């Protein structure tokens, strides 16, 4: 039952923080989410990519081209892992700096969320109470009909359906009325929350700290680019044998086709 109330609350509270509004645990940091996603994605690409390379090399075309992709796959995977290791610390430093610079803003927003939560909690409690009462009333009305069905014959199914339909419709109507009432009560607080968030962001936009942050972000991105250059060069060098094999196979195929045409 609590899940129903929490779901309804989320429907009426806007903003990216709404999904953490009722959470007791600390949300995962942006860096952790990005790092986990990148790791899973790259590992999946690496594993599935090797499978595709194996299938290609065992095919008729792969045997004819003889690119020897698998011979270079491990070195390429090692180069990609090295690239991740070199870029990782710089990226983590960037996210850590971002979280540190916005700690004050996040504290103020959390304070606003807590204040709004306290104001809307009575309405949520009332909604839960009325919903539970309606569900219990519906259960009491349906229970005798279930007993009647068990004791009756199959032909009474249609009669039971006719009796249940009005009760189900009544429950839906009452639930809809409760939701409408809850929406009416929560609307002012939802507007208040949006206004507070807009004010916080406007204050951040007008403050000098935003310009400082933009400069620092540019600096971090430049450092990230410099860190990535050696690893990207290693990746390019690792791809050269594959490209060279591909070029040789292409020209070999062209020469063979030319010879066949001239002999005909």
From Swiss-Prot:
The modification Methionine sulfoxide is found at residue 109. Glycosylated. Palmitoylated. It is found in: Secreted. The keyword Repeat applies. One of its GO terms (biological process) is acylglycerol homeostasis. The keyword RNA-binding does not apply. One of its GO terms (molecular function) is phosphatidylcholine-sterol O-acyltransferase activator activity. Sequence repeats lie at residues 67-88, 89-110, 111-121, 122-143, 144-165, 166-187, 188-207, 208-229, 230-240, 241-264. Residues 1-18 form the signal peptide. Residues 67-264 are annotated as: 10 X approximate tandem repeats. GO terms for cellular component: chylomicron; extracellular vesicle; high-density lipoprotein particle; low-density lipoprotein particle; very-low-density lipoprotein particle. Keywords: Cholesterol metabolism, Glycoprotein, HDL, Lipid metabolism, Lipid transport, Lipoprotein, Oxidation, Palmitate, Phosphoprotein, Repeat, Secreted, Signal, Steroid metabolism, Sterol metabolism, Transport. InterPro entries: ApoA_E, Apolipoprotein_A1/A4/E. It holds the Pfam family Apolipoprotein. Participates in the reverse transport of cholesterol from tissues to the liver for excretion by promoting cholesterol efflux from tissues and by acting as a cofactor for the lecithin cholesterol acyltransferase (LCAT). As part of the SPAP complex, activates spermatozoa motility. Belongs to the apolipoprotein A1/A4/E family. Homodimer. Interacts with APOA1BP and CLU. Component of a sperm activating protein complex (SPAP), consisting of APOA1, an immunoglobulin heavy chain, an immunoglobulin light chain and albumin. Interacts with NDRG1. Interacts with SCGB3A2. Interacts with NAXE and YJEFN3. This is Apolipoprotein A-I. It comes from Marmota marmota marmota (Alpine marmot). The gene is APOA1.
């Amino acid at each position: 039952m609590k899940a129903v109330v929490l779901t309804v609350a989320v429907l009426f509270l806007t903003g990216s923080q709404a999904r953490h509004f009722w959470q007791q645990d600390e949300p995962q940091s942006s860096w952790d989410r990005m790092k986990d996603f990148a790791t899973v994605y790259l590992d999946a690409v690496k594993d599935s990519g090797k499978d595709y390379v194996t299938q290609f090399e065992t095919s008729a075309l792969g045997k004819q081209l003889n690119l020897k992709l698998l011979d270079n796959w491990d070195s390429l995977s090692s180069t990609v892992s090295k690239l991740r290791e070199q870029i990782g610390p710089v990226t983590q430093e960037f996210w850590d700096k971002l979280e540190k610079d916005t700690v004050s803003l996040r504290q103020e927003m959390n304070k606003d969320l807590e204040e709004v939560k306290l104001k809307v909690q009575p309405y949520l409690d009332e909604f839960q109470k009325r919903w539970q009462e309606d569900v219990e009333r519906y259960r009491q009305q349906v229970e005798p009909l279930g007993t009647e069905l068990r004791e009756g014959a199959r032909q009474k199914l249609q009669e039971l359906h006719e009796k249940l339909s009005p009760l189900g419709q009544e429950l839906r109507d009452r639930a809809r009325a409760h939701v409408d009432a809850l929406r009416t009560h929560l609307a002012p607080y939802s507007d208040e929350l949006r206004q507070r968030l807009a004010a916080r962001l406007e204050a951040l936009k007008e403050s000098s700290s935003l310009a400082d942050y933009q400069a620092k972000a540019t600096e971090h991105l430049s450092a990230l680019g410099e860190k990535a250059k050696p690893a990207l060069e290693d990746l390019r060098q690792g791809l050269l044998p594959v490209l060279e094999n591909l070029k040789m196979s292409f020209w070999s195929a062209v020469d063979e086709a030319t010879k066949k045409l001239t002999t005909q």
